[in-house]
Amino acid sequence: MSEIADKVKKIVVEHLGVEESKVTPEASFIDDLGADSLDTVELVMAFEEAFSVEIPEDAAEKIATVKDAIDYIEKQKAA
Amino acid sequence: MGIVSPLGLGLEHNWSRLIAGESGIGRIASFDPSDLAAHVAGEVPVGPTEAGCLTLSDWVPVKDQKKMDRFIHLGLVAATEAVEDSGWKPESEEDRCRTGVMIGSGIGGLQTIYDASITVHEGRARRLSPFFIPSALINLVSGHVSIKYGFKGPNHSVVTACATGVHAIGDASRLIMLGDADVMVAGGAEAAVCPLGIAGFCSARALSTAFNDAPEKASRPWDRDRDGFVMGEGAGIVVLEEYEHAKARGARIYGEIVGYGMSGDAYHITAPAEGHEGAYRAMQAAVRSAGIAVSDIGYVNAHGTSTMADDLELQAVERLFGDDAGKLAMSSTKSAIGHLLGAAGAVEAIFSILAIRDNVAPPTLNLDNPSTESAIDRVAHEAQRRRIDVALSNSFGFGGTNASIIVRGV
C-alpha cells in the first residue's frame, strides 16, 4: 500500500473511531463506516490539512469511499 | 437524578461529600491562570469512575467528544445518571413522544467559540470544524440527550444566566402540568472555567481574588471577608414525571415540585435591587403557587454567591419569613462547589430534595464571621440534622432574572 493510502486510512480510523480492518478501499464513509454528512466534511478538511492539498467542494462531493479519497489525493500529488 | 460537580461524579458521592463539609474548590488546573486576577475555581475531578471522578470516555465515545463543547459532555454525564436512576427507558413510540428534554446552560460553548475565533482570525476560516456551531449551541445538550435515548417529546432549552437551572426544572414541570409531556428530563450544564470565562467575570469584578493562596476559603457566603464568587463547572439533571404516571410504573420518587415562582428586577444588568425585592417576589410567587404556608418551609438553599448581594437575599428571606425566620435553616452550597452558573439552580434543587430525604441541612463553609446578624440559622461549617419537609431553592441571574422553586417529600 502506498504511503498516501496508509495515511488516509489512519485519518479515517482516527476521525470516525472505526476499526482499522473495516477501512478497506471499497468502504463507503457513510454506508459502511458510520459517518454522517458533517463527518465527511470534517474528513475532507483533515485530508486537505494532512496532504497540503485543496479539495474543492464539487470534488469533495464525489469522494464517497476510501479509494476515492486515495485516488484523488494521489492524482493531486502527481500533478 | 444526576450530578457531576467539583465534588465529583454521582448523586450520592456528591451528597455525602457535601454533608461531610468537604470542598471542591482548588487552584485552576485545566489552564494556567497566572495572567488572571482570579486563580481559583471548582473543576470536576478527573480520574476513575469508581472513585467518583470523571473519565469522559466512559460516558461519551472518544470520536464524538470533539463534536461537543465540554458543557455538553458534562450535561450528558449527569443526564445519563439521571435517566438510568429513573429507570424510564420508553420503547413504544407513544411513550417516547410523551418524554421531553429541557436542559439549559448560562453561557454554552465558550471555549469552543474562543478556539473557533482564533481559527478564523488566523485566516483559516475554511478549516473551521463543521461541528463548531452544534458544539457551541446551548440547546444541544437537550438535543444529544434526546438522540441518545429516543425522547421525542418537547425539546427545549433555557438561557437565563445563573437562574437557568431553576427555570429549566420549573418550566419543564409546567409543561407536564399543561399536558405537553408525561416525563421531562430537565436541568442545567455549564463549563465556563476557561480563560475567556474567568477573564470576563474578572472584568466584571465578580470573582474572588483575595484567596488565591487558600482556594478552599474563597467561597464564603455571608462572611464579612467574602470578595466575590468562585466559578464552578458541572451539571445537574432531574427526571420529572407526572405523579400518577410515576406511581403506576412503581418509579422511585425522590420528591415533588410543589411551587415555582419567577420575577424580573427591571433595575440593573448585574446588581440586584434594594432589599432584593425581585427575589422576594419570586419566592412569594413560588409560595403562592405551592399553596403552602411560609412556615412549612424548613430549609432554603440560597443563591448565596459569596458576593455583596448575599445580604440582600438574606433581607428578602427575612422579610418573607417574618416571625418564622428563627425556625429556618438556610445555607449556600456554593461554599463547597462554587457557582455553577447555568447548572447551579439544578444542582441546588437536587441538594434541596436530598435535604428533605435525609432530614439534613448541608453546611455553609467558611462562614466564620457573618457580615450581618440574622435570626436565620445559616448552618455555618457543619451540616445539621433537622426535620425538613419542604425546601425552597433560589437562583438569580444577570439581567435581573429571579427564580424560586419549592420541593416537598412524597
UniProtKB/Swiss-Prot annotation, chain A:
Highest rank taxon of the organism: Bacteria
InterPro entries tied to this protein? ACP, ACP-like_sf, PP-bd_ACP, Ppantetheine_attach_site
Looking at the UniProt entry, the stretches that span the membrane are none
All copies of domain Carrier, residue ranges: 2-77
What compartments host this protein? Cytoplasm
Locate the O-(pantetheine 4'-phosphoryl)serine modifications and list their residues: S37
Molecular function GO terms recorded: acyl binding; acyl carrier activity
Pfam family of the protein (one): PP-binding
Q: What GO cellular-component annotations does this UniProt entry give?
A: cytosol; membrane
Any single biological process term in GO: lipid A biosynthetic process
PTM comment text: 4'-phosphopantetheine is transferred from CoA to a specific serine of apo-ACP by AcpS. This modification is essential for activity because fatty acids are bound in thioester linkage to the sulfhydryl of the prosthetic group.
Q: What does the record give as its pathway?
A: Lipid metabolism; fatty acid biosynthesis
Q: What keywords are annotated for this sequence in UniProt? A: Cytoplasm, Fatty acid biosynthesis, Fatty acid metabolism, Lipid biosynthesis, Lipid metabolism, Phosphopantetheine, Phosphoprotein
Disulfide bond positions: none
Q: Where is the signal peptide?
A: none
- Protein family (similarity comment): Belongs to the acyl carrier protein (ACP) family.
NCBIfam families per UniProt: acyl_carrier, PRK00982.1-2, PRK00982.1-3, PRK00982.1-4, PRK00982.1-5
| Role of this protein | Carrier of the growing fatty acid chain in fatty acid biosynthesis.
User: What name appears for this protein in its UniProt entry?
Assistant: Acyl carrier protein
* Biological classification of the source: Bacteria, Pseudomonadati, Pseudomonadota, Alphaproteobacteria, Acetobacterales
